[in-house]
Regions:
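N-terminal glycine-rich phosphate/pyrophosphate-binding loop and immediately adjacent elements
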Residues: 1-106
Length: 106
């Protein structure tokens, strides 16, 4: 069976992999030059920008996709825990570090 998945964000890639694991011939369509959807990262004027959420809060879902193909994710990706997830720099040059830990951010 042939399947088309539109969008290569986390959801699109996961859907394409699940279909492929079930024997479908999958075509993945993405309008941007890079995969990742809102999780992609791009550079502009010397700065690096997140296209959207890039913090992985449920790594077990990634592991599940690798298991479909009997692959060990450790052979392909490295997930590194970060103390600070994001640093926001405001116009007045003040900074706010977001870590996901309410006590740490007080």
């Amino acid at each position: 069976m042939n399947s088309i998945v539109i969008g290569s964000g986390f959801g699109g890639i996961a859907a394409a992999l699940r279909l492929k694991a079930k024997g479908h011939k999958v075509t993945l369509i993405e309008k941007h030059p890079d995969l990742g959807g809102r999780a992609r990262v791009f550079k502009k004027n010397g700065f690096i920008y997140d296209g959207g959420p890039t913090v992985i809060t449920a790594p077990y879902l990634i592991n599940e996709l690798f298991e479909l193909f009997k692959k060990d994710p450790k052979n392909y990706i490295v997930l590194t825990p970060l103390k600070v997830w994001y640093q926001f720099i405001f116009e007045d040059k003040t900074k706010f570090n977001y870590s996901g830990d309410e006590q740490e951010m007080k």
